[in-house]
């Protein structure tokens, strides 16, 4: 974990960041929360589902609730695209980080158009095939992190940092 954080900061060459952490509730949110040593002293906000685990874990955090379900749901993709435009215009993050799932897609594309750096962390349990979200955001990421060497065959420009969570 510390290696990842130092590496990320080195790559971005930014001392102070406004960070957007975007992810589905459940495991994706837990993974982002585990990056706390990185985001703890940063100006930050979250985008996730309005579910009990998210409300509990992020009770003292600035957060925006997105529309769900998101996986293969075109209606909510459109709604979340408009939400991304609204939230990102207001917040103007320097960096957007996600480990999935589909809610990350509109935030990454809109954020990239607005000049934010985007970093995607492919989930640990994917060691031989990509996630749909990973495939969709890979072309625009500033950094794409995988946790298995085998995944570099799928994502050649990815950085394998091993298990970071």
Segments from the language model and where they lie:
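N-terminal subdomain of nucleotide-sugar transferases
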Residues: 1-49, 55-58
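Active-site-proximal region of nucleotide-activated glycan assembly enzymes
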Residues: 116-165
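Residues at the starts of beta-strands that form the adenosine-phosphate
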Residues: 18, 43-46, 62, 117, ...
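Conserved nucleotide-sugar phosphate-binding/catalytic loop shared by glycosyltransferases and other
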Residues: 23-25, 41-80, 150, 161-164
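An amphipathic, basic-hydrophobic alpha-helix
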Residues: 72-94, 113
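Histidine-centered beta-alpha loop that forms part of the nucleotide-sugar donor binding/catalytic region
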Residues: 24, 101, 122-125
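An aromatic- and histidine-rich active-site surface loop
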Residues: 93-114
